[in-house]
Amino acid sequence: MQVLHVCSEMFPLLKTGGLADVIGALPAAQIADGVDARVLLPAFPDIRRGVTDAQVVSRRDTFAGHITLLFGHYNRVGIYLIDAPHLYDRPGSPYHDTNLFAYTDNVLRFALLGWVGAEMASGLDPFWRPDVVHAHDWHAGLAPAYLAARGRPAKSVFTVHNLAYQGMFYAHHMNDIQLPWSFFNIHGLEFNGQISFLKAGLYYADHITAVSPTYTREITEPQFAYGMEGLLQQRHREGRLSGVLNGVDEKIWSPETDLLLASRYTRDTLEDKAENKRQLQIAMGLKVDDKVPLFAVVSRLTSQKGLDLVLEALPGLLEQGGQLALLGAGDPVLQEGFLAAAAEYPGQVGVQIGYHEAFSHRIMGGADVILVPSRFEPCGLTQLYGLKYGTLPLVRRTGGLADTVSDCSLENLADGVASGFVFEDSNAWSLLRAIRRAFVLWSRPSLWRFVQRQAMAMDFSWQVAAKSYRELYYRLK
């Protein structure tokens, strides 16, 4: 079974979000599972520099200009690169300029990505062609459409990492992207009078996956579907929509081997986690005290992530004696709010604006509770890292958060399945009630340690996801 992942980023070469983490880990897990998985990416500068052994496979003149297809390896995974400097050789973000405006030629930049993905199934590399083209998010959404236009030389899977991003472009660009105008209708890639790369993936793929079972159900409902509910309900009825939970890359995220921690530990040596907490308190300007629970946030600061709820509930958390360490950036109003809280509550609130991968490891190793109060969350990786590190997640019951964290209710504690704290309603009162329950458990150290061990024993490895995808691919054949 030969599978080509078509996507726009890959950790650690280039990362703007969780998609990169998935592509950085899933193909390697699939190779270990017996699938010949490779990755197709635009040759953005950071990616091109990282694939040092790239060799020319093919050269083509396309609707988007001349391209060179390269092939090399990164971490023993085969990587195809679309080398088109006029489209991809730009500094900074792969999607927008330094003023945060989307590049005006994004329609060509990402149509080309989908086109090359489909051409791979028609022999663009004469020595390797995929049985399945697996496209990820709107950037690769046209790949299934190009495959359909070519008579489907390979099966296609389209994975939704976040349905909110739809890849919308003006209709006249149908003249530019080498797809038949007949594809531009409601039973195709048209959405609200425009081209939607996301809808193209949803409509033309042989199978759709979303990144958690609960999110898969949610996206068939108007609240979460952004107008796509009719199509997704139809795909669900046809048996062409399913959920595969993302995993954790244990080579990068493991407290036993994490060299970014001051003190490494396992579920059997949890006492060694205390030094990480002490170092984190020092680094964030917090009072060094192992008797108080240290809550943490590592997140984009947006209302989607529920960080306004954290700000509203913060006085209640601090009144009970807790501390907060925050690492993130985003909405300027939220940034200012957290910075003001740090100034008002020195020693109890520490804030670092920005994102630093290494420091996120130190927070995960040192905190007691990781807050993930998202209004919606397709899968979420932060709570999985928390589970792995014995940093109990406090989450809202939505998407992948609902699938991965079991509340510390009396019943779950008795059954030995409790792994964190879960609240229902997207408001500060509901969040604060969950925070209070965290304090109650904190007051019983032996029970807290028991739940930590339960959390750290859970298996969210990529091997589980790789097996699920392999079974899906074979069903499509």
From Swiss-Prot:
**Which top-rank group of organisms is this from?**
Bacteria
Q: Give any Pfam family that matches.
A: Glycos_transf_1
Q: Which reaction does it catalyse?
A: [(1->4)-alpha-D-glucosyl](n) + ADP-alpha-D-glucose = [(1->4)-alpha-D-glucosyl](n+1) + ADP + H(+)
GO BP, one annotated term: glycogen biosynthetic process
Keyword terms of this UniProt record = Glycogen biosynthesis, Glycosyltransferase, Transferase
One GO MF annotation is: alpha-1,4-glucan glucosyltransferase (UDP-glucose donor) activity
Q: What's its job?
A: Synthesizes alpha-1,4-glucan chains using ADP-glucose.
Q: What is this protein called?
A: Glycogen synthase
